[in-house]
């Protein structure tokens, strides 16, 4: 199981949100570049980066920082947040990003997902950020009219190979993942499913590993020191 430490960017700093609320941000590190280097030194196999300004405004507010990390930190990186057209996807892929995450765009523009998968295949992931099983869009401010399982199946049919599932009510809470919803999705599709939101400690990592989940995104737990990244990678990889 791959462990992906998270760097969420807002105003050029690393922040964590509570339950996806943009007004609840806590600055957890002032220098995202140094944070990425630290994660690499601790054995990170992949980095998960989200441009929260972009998620809300639909534009790449933190592109310079992302670019610096991609070019100077020798670890595969996936990036999401505000990526809503093929030009932005092209830009990130050309920059050297290993995987581009579509969220709002996947809910609102299926044609974009089809085109992106045709062009970039496994380099396209879709983030399913759900409230009570309903995918949310526009920086988690609006709810869609579809069920998260149906949406996951629809993305699988298009050819998406990686889904990132977040229960927004768990995000940033350190309360553990919504394992029940996560496993329903995992058992409904053949895609690689990455767990995100709520992971607190090594027991959560062990639970996900036991269920053969493809990956786990860890954020607040690392910054709050309730989870050792090195230990998580050690457990996840064995």
Curated annotation (Swiss-Prot):
It holds the Pfam family His_biosynth. Keywords: Amino-acid biosynthesis, Cytoplasm, Histidine biosynthesis, Isomerase. It is an enzyme of class 5 (isomerase). GO terms for biological process: L-histidine biosynthetic process; L-tryptophan biosynthetic process. One of its GO terms (molecular function) is 1-(5-phosphoribosyl)-5-[(5-phosphoribosylamino)methylideneamino]imidazole-4-carboxamide isomerase activity. SUPFAM superfamilies: Ribulose-phoshate binding barrel. It is found in: Cytoplasm. The keyword Zinc-finger does not apply. It catalyses: 1-(5-phospho-beta-D-ribosyl)-5-[(5-phospho-beta-D-ribosylamino)methylideneamino]imidazole-4-carboxamide = 5-[(5-phospho-1-deoxy-D-ribulos-1-ylimino)methylamino]-1-(5-phospho-beta-D-ribosyl)imidazole-4-carboxamide. Pathway: Amino-acid biosynthesis; L-histidine biosynthesis; L-histidine from 5-phospho-alpha-D-ribose 1-diphosphate: step 4/9. Its EC number is 5.3.1.16. It comes from the Bacteria. InterPro entries: Aldolase_TIM, His_biosynth, HisA_bact_arch, Isoase_HisA-like, Isoase_HisA-like_bact, RibuloseP-bd_barrel. Its main location: cytoplasm. GO terms for cellular component: cytoplasm. The active site is at residues 8, 129. Belongs to the HisA/HisF family. This is 1-(5-phosphoribosyl)-5-[(5-phosphoribosylamino)methylideneamino] imidazole-4-carboxamide isomerase. It comes from Clostridium kluyveri (strain ATCC 8527 / DSM 555 / NBRC 12016 / NCIMB 10680 / K1). The lineage of its organism: Bacteria, Bacillati, Bacillota, Clostridia, Eubacteriales. The gene is hisA.
């Amino acid at each position: 199981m791959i462990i992906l430490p998270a760097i969420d960017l807002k105003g050029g700093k690393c922040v964590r949100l509570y339950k996806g609320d943009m007004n609840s941000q806590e600055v957890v590190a002032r220098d995202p570049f140094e944070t990425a280097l630290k994660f690499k030194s601790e054995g990170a196999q992949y980095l998960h980066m989200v441009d929260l300004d972009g998620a809300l405004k639909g534009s790449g507010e933190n592109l310079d920082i992302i670019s610096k990390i991609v070019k100077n930190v020798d670890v595969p990186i996936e990036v999401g947040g505000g990526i809503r057209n093929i030009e932005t996807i092209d830009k990130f892929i050309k920059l050297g990003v290993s995987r581009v995450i579509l969220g709002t765009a996947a809910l609102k523009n299926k044609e974009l997902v089809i085109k992106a998968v045709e062009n970039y295949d496994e380099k396209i992931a879709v983030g399913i950020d759900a409230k009570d099983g309903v995918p949310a869009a526009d920086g988690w401010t609006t709810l869609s009219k579809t069920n998260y399982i149906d949406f996951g199946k629809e993305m699988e049919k298009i050819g998406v190979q990686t889904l990132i599932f977040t229960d927004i009510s768990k995000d940033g809470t350190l309360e553990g993942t919504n394992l029940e919803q996560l496993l329903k999705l995992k058992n409904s599709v053949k895609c690689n499913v990455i767990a995100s939101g709520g992971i607190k400690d090594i027991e959560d990592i062990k639970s996900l590993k036991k269920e053969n989940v493809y990956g786990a995104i860890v954020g607040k737990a690392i910054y709050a020191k309730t989870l050792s990244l090195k230990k998580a990678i050690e457990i996840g990889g064995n």
